[in-house]
Each structure stands twice: as structure tokens, then as C-alpha cells.
Amino acid sequence: MSTSTLKKVALYTLGAFSGVALSLSVQSFAAEKDKKDNETLPVQSIRNMAEVYGQIKANYYQDKSDADLFEGAMKGMVSDLDPHSEYMDKKGYADMKESTSGEFGGLGMEIGQEDGFIKVIAPIEDTPAERAGVKSGDFIAKIDNVSTRGLTTSEAVKKMRGKPGTKITLTLSRKNVDKPIVVNLTRAIIKVKSVRHHLLEPNYGYIRVSQFQERTVAGINEAAKALIKANKGAPLKGIILDLRDDPGGLLDGAVGVSAAFLPADAKVVSTKGRDGKEGMVLKARPEDYIRTSGRDPLADLPAELKTIPMTVLINSGSASASEIVAGALQDHKRAVVVGTQSFGKGSVQTLIPLSNGSAVKLTTALYYTPNDRSIQAQGIVPDVEVKDKDRAFESREADLAGHIGNPLGGEDVNSSNEISTPDSNE
């Protein structure tokens, strides 16, 4: 189904539900340690590692530095945990911090890892990757004719970024396409405008969020004001929030975007850690989405945004922060969710800087919607399913090797066992 057709369905949904009473960062968190974590080091395992180290130093046919060996050991230790945990060297850590600021030199795509290869979660709008035809679910088999097998995501990012204007070649593997796809791209400064908007027709607004960044919450406020102005100052009768192919981003951005549409202090998301231990509870309040001590970006938000009938669009490329928003608005019956089942990345990554300037990113908890649903490996099921017939392949969290299963039970949803809703349309 084309984008224009899906928007028409969303507009119809807005009209159908307008009579219903509408109720109602990457961010580092301090890792808590339980007493049982304070165990002694496994001496025999340390001895085994030292023995392997000694054999490499004595017998490997090339000389390897101690730094390279120990970096490799740390990468292997962390990467085997799950697809999103990762050891980052100094450069990888710096690149990761840069990517959330909204401007960087590269190709413009969100990537992950599966079976030792780099996989595209979603290309970013209006970037070299999107213009070259890179699609969600593509595997990047080679970068400049060098295999990506075994690369971490931060290592792949490092290889794909570079001086603007320089050339790079990616070899892609795409499901149901027999031959490798070779694309030639030119690196560019990626200025990600995370919020776009326009009037679909008089009285009906459209807001697109492509990624959750530092200015996304303020961008929602600016978009709402601009839509009202474009509507000649008249109140809007409905709004569409498009989160399709939004790979996520900053947690506080997700909380702030949710807060723009929810009553004050409404629960947005919570976390649970090891053994179901309760973690954070984040609500629609400034202290839970303001990154610094600055002004509330929603302070002068048009009041109608809290009650206006709305539809949220999602698909299998909607991940992480976008799933938090869709889940919160769905649970509070604030919006009708339309599209296909989302990606299912419901895990919290804690970024822990290390003393040498590197960092380790660890999965430390899972996200839960206001109604205590876990997003992990199952995603958000739309209220109204509308399949995108132009989308040949759906890729989800449950397709990733080593993914964490949903703690509440039920079948993890991958590309081969999507859950259909009662309203599904073929």
C-alpha cells in the first residue's frame, strides 16, 4: 500500500474514532548491583584465559600486541550477550555520542548486528543511504569490498563514516534477491531534521518523526504551532503522527513526544531489570524529558494537542523509542495505532564509560508500556493492520540471533510469524 493510501486510511481512522472519548538517549543510567553480583572472580576461568593468551603470544604466526588481544577479548565477551550489548573503543564511543546530536558525516542509516553481519534497521530520510535505495532488512556484506563479518556495529559505523564528499561502496544482501546489490555512495554531512510536518487537507495535520534526538521534543511543539498557523488559526480536527521506519534514539525524546499528547503526569514507560526488579517510571512531566536544566520545550504547547483525535502510523522499522511512544498512546487510548507490527526492541542499554576513554554498552533492563506490556521481541500490535504491499521484507528484533525473549511469554514475532489483529486487511 502506498504512503498516500495509508495516510487516507489514517484520516478515515481519525474520523471513525473522533467521537470516542479520549482519556486521559542514548542516556546513561547508574547500574545498581545486587549483593549476589559481588561474587569472587572465577579463578579457573581466568587461568584458562591466561593460558589462551600465552599460547597466542608464543605460537601465533604473527605478533599481536597485548592491547589488540585484550580489546578482542572484551569485544567477544560483550557481543555474545545479545545483539545490542557492545564494547566500544575510544573512536566508537565518540562516534556514538556524535550520532545523537543530529549532525555527522556519513551515509545515514541505523544498523545492528545479526549472525556476525551488519544489518540495516532503517535508512534515515533524505540521506545518501535512502537515496541509494538501501532498505530496512538489508545485510551489509561488504564495505569497500571488505567483508563485514565479525564487525561490531561501532566498527562498521567507523568504516562508513568519513570526510564528506568521499566515496564508499557497499555490497548488500537482500532477501529474495539472488545476486548481491552493489551501491556506490558519497559521504555527506548528515543533518537529520527529525520532525517534519504539513497539512494533509484543511483541519488535518501530519507530523513525521524520523528519529528521536535532542531537539525532537521542541520540534513537535514547533510543528504543532506551524500546522495551526497553516490552518488559518482554526483548531485542528485530527492529526497523524508518523513513526514508520523510525529506529528510535533518545529515551527522553520519546517521553517528551508522548508528553505532548498525554495528560500531565500520565505514565509513559517503566523498566524492569534482572529478576524483574522494578526500575524507572517515567511520566509526562518536564523533569522526565528535559535533558538539561533549560526551559521546558513544551511550555507553550498548543492545548488542543492533548485532546485532538489522532492516529499513529507504525511498521516493522519502528523501533525502541518510537515503540515507547506508540505503546504509551495506545495504552492510554489516546490514539489509534495503524500499520504493521513494530520491530520489538524493548531493551534498555546502559552506556558505561570506562577509565581508558572507551565504553561498554550493556542491556540492563526491559521497557514496559503503561499497561505493563513488554515490547521486547513482540513489538506493538496495531489497532488497525494495514500492510505495506511495497515492502517486500519485514525484519524484526526476533530475527536477530541471540535476542532476548519476551519475559511475559508468548511467541516472539519475527518476519515469518507476524501476529494479525482482528481488523487485519490483506
Where are the predicted features?
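Flexible, low-complexity junctional segments that flank or bridge functional domains
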Residues: S2-I239, D245-P247, A260-P263, T421-N425
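C-terminal "post-core" interaction segments
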Residues: S23, V195-E426
